[in-house]
Amino acid sequence: MPRGDRYELRWFTPRCEVKLCGHATLASAFVLMTILEPGRESIPFETRFSGPLTVRRDGALLAMDFPALAPWVCTAPPATLHEALGKDPAAVMQVEDNYFAVYEREEDVRGIRPDFRLVEKLHPAGVAITAPGVDSDFVSRYFAPSYGFPEDPVTGSTHCSLAPFWAEQLGMTSLHARQLSERGGELWCEVRGDRVILKGNAVLTLQGKLLI
């Protein structure tokens, strides 16, 4: 919704409103920049839970300026987390309502077959799994059946935590990430203090008119 030179933005899954959503922000900015306001180089958004966000053109990509949410060590993860994932992680981190299970190898992340019934019973809303990548700096997957989807194809919001975590682990501020869902996706991340720049692309697949 436009408000002055900005747009108000909120995100909803089939079940609830969420605090931050990367792909919906990317898609909103893409539509504004290419259809509603063609030629515009940046779009500022005001959001209910995540404050001001800005999306800018960066060559062929769109760069989203999001808050960094560094994870902390979860000292007492629920036993059902390990049971839900089917393989013990090397470490468990936490950010707000998400757990982050850290594995040692990319193939561990690829091979996880979660029990979504158990994942949904966990108090936090979602579970991300991650590991160092083979042809990227790190990889991840994200499960959130309590939000209304078993596995998210690409999750910008979790990379607000994954990027600071792997930046510290790898001694890098610019990282290339892959999400290993069935559809798959890749992001380019830059950690800048308390902000994370997430870069990706968008493709127009359908256009039409709705008469009200």
Residue ranges with predicted function:
Residues 1-20, 24-212:
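Active-site proximal loop and beta-alpha junction motif in alpha/beta enzyme cores
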